[in-house]
């Protein structure tokens, strides 16, 4: 069993659920404390039951010393994998740098995707001293997957889809779960270089992830 989760320092639901009636402040201390408490509880529960985890660090969590310290400690003590997620982009640092509130990696231009990937992977390396062997997002299109494998060949696997993010993800209005079967395969697969959701038919189509 592999438990995969992430320290989501700026949960996407936060401003809708816990921030109602308040001025937007994605950096407020209460939000960060709540997010870290959730992460700690998940880690504690897994380890108490003898399970290892894959900690998918988000861009936002890479700026949080406590989240980074916990990941390092649990990597050494329990053998947890430290991975990298392309979720968790909408933090203050990201908004200031890219001048946008958008956070869906698949909706950016290819040039912006490359810049964001290099930024996130570079920040990860700065904090941990190595590059991750796995990554992920709600949806990773073929161009993005191909670029990551070419630029960061140590990446072996990716959570490249979410059960509700499929072809309709590009509408960016998938706010209900009626698209239950719109996502990618529900089991491991080798994605095609042409289409992430299409399994590679042969070695030539193999994306390498």
PLM segments and residue spans:
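Short glycine/serine/threonine/alanine-rich loop segments
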Residues: 51, 130, 154
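Metal-dependent polysaccharide deacetylase catalytic core of the NodB/CE4 family, i.e.
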Residues: 57-139, 196-209
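Glycine-rich loops and low-complexity Gly/Arg-rich segments
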Residues: 27, 78-83, 108, 159-163, ...
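Amphipathic alpha-helical segments that form well-ordered structural scaffolds
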Residues: 38-45, 116-123, 127, 147, ...
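Short catalytic/ligand-binding loop motif for oxyanion handling, primarily in non-cytosolic enzymes
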Residues: 10-12, 62-66, 90-94, 141-146, ...
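Extracellular structured ligand-interaction cores
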Residues: 2, 52, 79-81, 132, ...
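Active-site beta->alpha N-cap acidic-glycine motif
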Residues: 1-78
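Active-site-adjacent pocket scaffolds in enzyme catalytic domains
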Residues: 133-209
